[in-house]
Protein backbone atom coordinates (compact mmCIF):
# COMPACT_ATOMS: atom_id res chain seq x y z
CA UNK A 1 0.00 0.00 0.00
CA UNK A 2 1.46 3.37 -0.99
CA UNK A 3 1.83 6.18 1.50
CA UNK A 4 -0.71 8.15 -0.54
CA UNK A 5 -3.41 5.50 -0.20
CA UNK A 6 -6.53 6.20 1.82
CA UNK A 7 -5.73 4.27 4.97
CA UNK A 8 -9.21 4.52 6.45
CA UNK A 9 -10.88 3.32 3.26
CA UNK A 10 -8.50 0.38 3.30
CA UNK A 11 -9.35 -0.48 6.88
CA UNK A 12 -13.08 -0.11 6.42
CA UNK A 13 -12.92 -2.23 3.28
CA UNK A 14 -10.86 -4.95 4.93
CA UNK A 15 -13.19 -4.93 7.93
CA UNK A 16 -16.26 -5.25 5.73
CA UNK A 17 -15.99 -8.73 4.32
CA UNK A 18 -14.36 -11.07 6.78
CA UNK A 19 -14.63 -12.59 10.22
CA UNK A 20 -17.88 -12.42 12.17
CA UNK A 21 -17.55 -13.28 15.87
CA UNK A 22 -20.56 -15.20 17.17
CA UNK A 23 -23.07 -13.32 19.31
CA UNK A 24 -21.30 -9.95 19.21
CA UNK A 25 -24.00 -8.38 21.37
CA UNK A 26 -22.75 -10.49 24.30
CA UNK A 27 -19.49 -8.56 24.15
CA UNK A 28 -21.11 -5.12 24.13
CA UNK A 29 -21.14 -4.60 27.90
CA UNK A 30 -18.57 -7.25 28.79
CA UNK A 31 -15.70 -6.10 31.00
CA UNK A 32 -12.56 -6.84 28.97
CA UNK A 33 -9.27 -6.53 30.88
CA UNK A 34 -6.26 -5.70 28.72
CA UNK A 35 -4.02 -5.44 31.77
CA UNK A 36 -4.86 -5.77 35.48
CA UNK A 37 -5.28 -1.97 35.53
CA UNK A 38 -6.80 -1.24 32.11
CA UNK A 39 -10.22 -2.36 30.85
CA UNK A 40 -12.54 -1.88 27.88
CA UNK A 41 -16.29 -2.26 27.48
CA UNK A 42 -19.30 -0.60 25.87
CA UNK A 43 -20.72 2.65 27.22
CA UNK A 44 -23.00 3.04 30.21
CA UNK A 45 -26.56 2.28 29.09
CA UNK A 46 -29.26 4.93 28.85
CA UNK A 47 -31.50 2.43 30.63
CA UNK A 48 -30.87 3.18 34.29
CA UNK A 49 -31.52 -0.38 35.48
CA UNK A 50 -29.00 -1.75 33.00
CA UNK A 51 -26.60 1.09 33.79
CA UNK A 52 -26.65 0.36 37.53
CA UNK A 53 -25.92 -3.30 36.78
CA UNK A 54 -22.97 -2.26 34.61
CA UNK A 55 -21.57 -0.01 37.31
CA UNK A 56 -21.88 -2.80 39.88
CA UNK A 57 -19.99 -5.14 37.56
CA UNK A 58 -17.32 -2.52 36.98
CA UNK A 59 -16.85 -1.89 40.68
CA UNK A 60 -16.67 -5.65 41.28
CA UNK A 61 -13.87 -5.71 38.68
CA UNK A 62 -12.07 -3.01 40.66
CA UNK A 63 -12.71 -0.10 38.29
CA UNK A 64 -11.90 3.24 39.92
CA UNK A 65 -11.83 5.59 36.91
CA UNK A 66 -13.78 5.78 33.66
CA UNK A 67 -12.79 7.63 30.48
CA UNK A 68 -15.80 7.87 28.13
CA UNK A 69 -14.74 8.64 24.56
CA UNK A 70 -18.15 8.57 22.85
CA UNK A 71 -19.77 11.84 21.83
CA UNK A 72 -23.32 10.48 21.83
CA UNK A 73 -24.09 11.05 25.49
CA UNK A 74 -22.48 12.13 28.74
CA UNK A 75 -23.48 9.97 31.71
CA UNK A 76 -21.19 11.68 34.17
CA UNK A 77 -23.93 12.73 36.60
CA UNK A 78 -25.44 9.24 36.63
CA UNK A 79 -22.07 7.58 37.23
CA UNK A 80 -21.25 10.04 40.02
CA UNK A 81 -24.55 9.48 41.81
CA UNK A 82 -24.62 5.69 41.43
CA UNK A 83 -21.02 4.62 41.98
CA UNK A 84 -17.65 5.58 43.43
CA UNK A 85 -16.08 5.60 39.96
CA UNK A 86 -14.48 8.85 38.80
CA UNK A 87 -15.85 9.84 35.39
CA UNK A 88 -13.84 11.66 32.69
CA UNK A 89 -15.58 12.67 29.46
CA UNK A 90 -13.38 12.94 26.33
CA UNK A 91 -16.02 12.25 23.71
CA UNK A 92 -15.46 12.33 19.95
CA UNK A 93 -17.62 11.39 16.98
CA UNK A 94 -17.27 7.98 15.33
CA UNK A 95 -17.38 9.49 11.86
CA UNK A 96 -14.60 7.43 10.31
CA UNK A 97 -12.51 10.57 9.88
CA UNK A 98 -8.99 11.32 10.98
CA UNK A 99 -8.49 11.54 14.74
CA UNK A 100 -6.97 14.76 16.00
CA UNK A 101 -3.56 14.10 17.62
CA UNK A 102 -4.66 16.37 20.47
CA UNK A 103 -7.34 13.82 21.36
CA UNK A 104 -4.73 11.08 21.74
CA UNK A 105 -2.63 13.47 23.83
CA UNK A 106 -5.57 14.17 26.11
CA UNK A 107 -6.62 10.54 26.47
CA UNK A 108 -3.12 9.24 27.15
CA UNK A 109 -2.03 12.01 29.50
CA UNK A 110 -5.21 11.49 31.53
CA UNK A 111 -4.80 7.72 31.53
CA UNK A 112 -1.12 7.75 32.48
CA UNK A 113 -1.79 10.08 35.39
CA UNK A 114 -4.51 7.73 36.65
CA UNK A 115 -2.32 4.66 36.21
CA UNK A 116 0.50 6.17 38.25
CA UNK A 117 -1.45 4.80 41.20
CA UNK A 118 -0.99 1.01 41.13
CA UNK A 119 -4.34 0.60 42.87
CA UNK A 120 -6.24 2.39 40.11
CA UNK A 121 -8.17 0.44 37.49
CA UNK A 122 -9.14 2.42 34.40
CA UNK A 123 -12.11 1.66 32.14
CA UNK A 124 -12.16 3.14 28.64
CA UNK A 125 -15.29 2.89 26.48
CA UNK A 126 -16.95 4.32 23.45
CA UNK A 127 -20.60 3.47 22.84
CA UNK A 128 -20.30 -0.01 21.34
CA UNK A 129 -16.67 -0.69 22.22
CA UNK A 130 -15.80 -1.37 18.60
CA UNK A 131 -13.68 1.54 17.36
CA UNK A 132 -13.10 4.65 19.46
CA UNK A 133 -12.69 2.91 22.82
CA UNK A 134 -10.30 0.23 21.55
CA UNK A 135 -8.36 2.86 19.56
CA UNK A 136 -8.00 5.03 22.66
CA UNK A 137 -6.91 1.97 24.62
CA UNK A 138 -4.37 1.16 21.91
CA UNK A 139 -2.92 4.68 22.23
CA UNK A 140 -2.63 4.22 26.00
CA UNK A 141 -0.79 0.92 25.52
CA UNK A 142 1.63 2.60 23.12
CA UNK A 143 2.24 5.31 25.70
CA UNK A 144 2.87 2.59 28.28
CA UNK A 145 5.63 1.18 26.09
CA UNK A 146 3.82 -1.67 24.36
CA UNK A 147 4.95 -2.79 20.90
CA UNK A 148 2.33 -1.83 18.31
CA UNK A 149 1.25 -5.24 17.01
CA UNK A 150 1.35 -6.80 20.46
CA UNK A 151 -1.06 -4.10 21.64
CA UNK A 152 -3.43 -4.72 18.72
CA UNK A 153 -3.30 -8.46 19.32
CA UNK A 154 -4.05 -8.14 23.03
CA UNK A 155 -6.97 -5.79 22.43
CA UNK A 156 -8.50 -8.18 19.87
CA UNK A 157 -7.84 -11.20 22.09
CA UNK A 158 -9.69 -9.83 25.11
CA UNK A 159 -12.38 -8.05 23.05
CA UNK A 160 -13.08 -9.96 19.81
CA UNK A 161 -15.39 -7.20 18.51
CA UNK A 162 -12.63 -4.54 18.64
CA UNK A 163 -12.11 -3.27 15.09
CA UNK A 164 -9.92 -0.37 16.25
CA UNK A 165 -10.09 1.49 12.93
CA UNK A 166 -8.37 4.58 14.34
CA UNK A 167 -5.23 2.64 15.21
CA UNK A 168 -3.32 3.99 12.21
CA UNK A 169 -4.01 7.52 13.42
CA UNK A 170 -2.87 6.45 16.88
CA UNK A 171 0.42 4.91 15.80
CA UNK A 172 1.15 7.88 13.52
CA UNK A 173 0.52 10.19 16.47
CA UNK A 174 2.75 8.13 18.75
CA UNK A 175 5.72 7.86 16.39
CA UNK A 176 5.62 11.62 15.78
CA UNK A 177 5.08 12.28 19.48
CA UNK A 178 8.25 10.34 20.31
CA UNK A 179 10.38 12.07 17.68
CA UNK A 180 10.10 9.64 14.78
CA UNK A 181 10.80 10.82 11.25
CA UNK A 182 8.57 10.43 8.20
CA UNK A 183 10.13 7.10 7.25
CA UNK A 184 9.45 5.69 10.72
CA UNK A 185 5.88 6.97 10.55
CA UNK A 186 5.30 5.23 7.21
CA UNK A 187 6.80 1.99 8.51
CA UNK A 188 4.69 2.02 11.67
CA UNK A 189 1.50 2.76 9.74
CA UNK A 190 2.27 0.02 7.22
CA UNK A 191 2.71 -2.49 10.06
CA UNK A 192 -0.68 -1.58 11.51
CA UNK A 193 -2.31 -1.81 8.08
CA UNK A 194 -0.73 -5.22 7.59
CA UNK A 195 -1.98 -6.42 10.96
CA UNK A 196 -5.52 -5.43 10.03
CA UNK A 197 -5.19 -7.12 6.65
CA UNK A 198 -4.17 -10.33 8.39
CA UNK A 199 -6.78 -10.02 11.16
CA UNK A 200 -9.92 -8.62 9.51
CA UNK A 201 -13.33 -8.19 11.12
CA UNK A 202 -16.69 -7.48 9.51
CA UNK A 203 -17.24 -4.11 11.16
CA UNK A 204 -20.57 -3.40 9.48
CA UNK A 205 -21.93 -6.74 10.64
CA UNK A 206 -20.80 -6.11 14.22
CA UNK A 207 -22.41 -2.68 14.40
CA UNK A 208 -25.65 -3.92 12.83
CA UNK A 209 -25.78 -6.98 15.07
CA UNK A 210 -25.19 -5.08 18.29
CA UNK A 211 -27.64 -2.35 17.31
CA UNK A 212 -30.45 -4.64 16.15
CA UNK A 213 -30.19 -7.11 19.02
CA UNK A 214 -29.79 -4.62 21.84
CA UNK A 215 -31.47 -1.45 20.64
CA UNK A 216 -28.13 0.36 20.84
What role is predicted for each listed range?
Residues 68, 124-125:
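Class I SAM-dependent methyltransferase core
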Residues 2-47:
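Mobile, glycine- and charge-enriched loop segments
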Residues 2-18, 105-122, 128-130, 135-216:
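PTP/DSP superfamily signal
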Residues 24, 50-52, 107:
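Amphipathic coiled-coil/heptad-repeat helices and related helical stalk/stem segments
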Amino acid sequence: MSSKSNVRSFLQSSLGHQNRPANPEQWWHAVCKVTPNLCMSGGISNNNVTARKQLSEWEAAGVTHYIAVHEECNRGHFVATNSNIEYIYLGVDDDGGKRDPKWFDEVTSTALKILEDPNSVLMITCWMGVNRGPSATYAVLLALGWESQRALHEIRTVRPIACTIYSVDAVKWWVKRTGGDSQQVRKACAEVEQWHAENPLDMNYLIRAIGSRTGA
